[in-house]
Amino acid sequence: MCDAFVGTWKLVSSENFDDYMKEVGVGFATRKVAGMAKPTLIISVNGDVVTIKSESTFKNTEISFKLGQEFDEVTPDDRKVKSTINLDGGALVQVQNWDGKSTTIKRKLVDDKLVLECVMNGVTATRVYERA
């Protein structure tokens, strides 16, 4: 199911992330620090529970979830959201909902790279990770 995503991934490129964070409502100072961070993602699967750890100089976060089951998440910019992650066409598609707002984060494998597409209100950021 999600085994292809398992491993350690390092950020190698980021496009339009500041504009995306601005659309989400992240403040200026947090956007600047987060934009400079080069996170490492560690993805693991234990039974039907998927864990995604993000480690960076900005903040370390960890989410554990079962596909299709809503869970509470505190995002790196301290938003308290309700998240649901599904496997759709080989991609992990996460929807975060908070305060009447919604954003989608799609994680997919392209040429052995992990590509994140973050979308809110038509603003898209693309972040590419390679296996560490």
Swiss-Prot record:
Subcellular location: Cytoplasm; Nucleus
Signal peptide interval: none
N-acetylcysteine, modified sites: 2
Keyword hit for Phosphoprotein: yes
Keyword Cytoplasm belongs to the record: yes
Modified residues (Phosphoserine): 13
One MF term in the entry's GO annotations: long-chain fatty acid transmembrane transporter activity
InterPro entries listed in its UniProt record: Calycin, Fatty_acid-bd, ILBP, Lipocln_cytosolic_FA-bd_dom
Keywords: Acetylation, Cytoplasm, Lipid-binding, Nucleus, Phosphoprotein, Transport
One of the Pfam families matching this protein, by short name: Lipocalin
Main location: cytoplasm
Motif Nuclear localization signal per record, residues: 22-32
UniProt-listed GO biological process terms: long-chain fatty acid transport
Binding site for a fatty acid: 127-129
PROSITE patterns, per the entry: FABP
SUPFAM superfamilies: Lipocalins (SSF50814)
Chain positions found as Phosphotyrosine: 20
Gene Ontology CC: cytoplasm; nucleus
PANTHER family: FATTY ACID BINDING PROTEIN
UniProt remark on domains: Forms a beta-barrel structure that accommodates the hydrophobic ligand in its interior.
Function: Lipid transport protein in adipocytes. Binds both long chain fatty acids and retinoic acid. Delivers long-chain fatty acids and retinoic acid to their cognate receptors in the nucleus.
Subunit description: Monomer. Homodimer. Interacts with PPARG.
Similarity section: Belongs to the calycin superfamily. Fatty-acid binding protein (FABP) family.
Name of the protein this chain belongs to: Fatty acid-binding protein, adipocyte
Organism expressing this protein natively: Cervus elaphus (Red deer)
Biological classification of the source: Eukaryota, Metazoa, Chordata, Craniata, Vertebrata
Annotated gene: FABP4
